[in-house]
């Protein structure tokens, strides 16, 4: 890497959104100069000029100092980033790339900055048909939705699910939920989208939902460990009490892909759905995609999917100065679709 004269990260005006734990146990966060040390860039790292970064629920947690996500201090959040290679890793300067996971925004500085440095093995060439902002509108949310729907297809379709069976997506107004609605509908399933936001009805219907319901409309007040089976497959982005209730209503041989915890991290349930109906509860972790080839294949699928959903998919462009406010709104359940940070 070059000396610090003109070095990416030390350029005048290069900024980031950084969070740190204060001595009194509080959290201090905001926009500040990125200020890299050139010696800190390892030989196997790639430096990327960030053009856009996806805003995920994990980023909202990191931005507010949640210890389960913010593993180091100080930290630049942003588990997704897209931009162009500046140097390193044997990649040509100017190559359009995307990167997700690999500790970004958790154990190492992430994409809410003008530049990011990442392990070369984490970098994926951006599909030519997917713009930088479209890539981040998809991001980890899109990858997670694809993995979840693939897992459900293996578990549920293998038992010859009927075409008229209903598939549920909870938290359908969020990025993962909306993507899951689109993926399941494209596979020919009858999708029921669950959201407490009235404003989401038109959007998720446009993405392929056959029906839109509120959480209270699918919760059965009966204090039983099992209720009438309704769902063949479920993509759950909420967790907590809603996931526990949904499990009781999964049909025999059905499955639930668990993704999020916006509704709570605790799961109070019984073993009855699993041992009496053969229900599978599968955890989904998009950060655990093992190889570059598998990640690249998923990105190619997102590039094919995006043109079919772009017109209906809500995307909000955010400046670095907007990060704190958007994080608070996301944690309060007040956002819809995807936010993308443009760190220019």
Question: How does the language model describe each region?
Answer:
Residues 98, 232-235, 257:
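N-terminal Rossmann-like NAD(P) cofactor-binding module of classical short-chain dehydrogenase/reductase
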Residues 99-167:
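NAD(P)H dinucleotide-binding glycine-rich loop of Rossmann-like/cofactor-binding domains
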Residues 4-5, 9-12, 293-344:
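C-terminal hydrophobic helical "lid"/dimerization subdomain
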């Amino acid at each position: 890497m070059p000396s610090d004269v003109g070095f990416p990260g030390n350029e005048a005006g290069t900024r980031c959104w950084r969070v740190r734990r204060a001595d009194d146990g509080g959290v201090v966060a905001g926009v500040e100069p990125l200020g890299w040390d050139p010696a800190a860039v390892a030989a196997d790292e790639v430096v990327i000029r960030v053009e856009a970064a996806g805003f995920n629920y994990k980023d909202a947690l990191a931005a507010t100092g949640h210890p389960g996500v913010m593993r180091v201090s100080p930290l630049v959040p942003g588990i997704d980033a897209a931009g162009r290679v500046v140097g390193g890793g044997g990649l040509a300067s100017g190559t359009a790339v995307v990167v997700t996971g690999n500790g970004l925004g958790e154990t190492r500085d992430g994409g809410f900055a003008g530049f990011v440095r990442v392990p070369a093995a984490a970098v994926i060439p951006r599909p030519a048909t997917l713009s930088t902002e479209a890539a981040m509108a998809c991001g980890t949310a899109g990858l997670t939705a694809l993995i979840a729907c693939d897992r459900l297809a293996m578990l549920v379709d293998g038992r010859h699910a009927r075409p008229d069976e209903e598939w549920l997506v909870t938290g359908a107004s969020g990025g993962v939920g909306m993507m899951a609605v689109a993926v399941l509908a494209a596979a020919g399933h009858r999708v029921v989208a669950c959201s407490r936001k009235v404003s989401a009805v038109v959007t998720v219907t446009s993405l392929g939902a056959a029906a839109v319901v509120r959480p209270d409309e699918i919760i059965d007040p009966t204090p039983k460990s099992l209720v009438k089976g309704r769902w063949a497959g479920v993509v759950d982005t909420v967790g907590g009490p809603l996931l526990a209730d949904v499990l009781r209503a999964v049909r025999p041989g059905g499955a639930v892909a668990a993704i999020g915890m916006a509704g709570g991290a605790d799961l109070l349930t019984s073993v009855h759905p699993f041992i009496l109906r053969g229900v599978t509860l599968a955890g989904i972790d998009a950060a655990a995609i093992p190889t570059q080839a598998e990640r690249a294949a998923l990105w190619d699928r997102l590039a094919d999917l995006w043109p079919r959903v772009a017109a209906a998919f809500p995307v909000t462009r955010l400046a670095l100065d907007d990060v704190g406010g958007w994080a608070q709104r996301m944690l309060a359940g007040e956002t819809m679709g995807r936010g993308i940070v443009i760190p220019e």
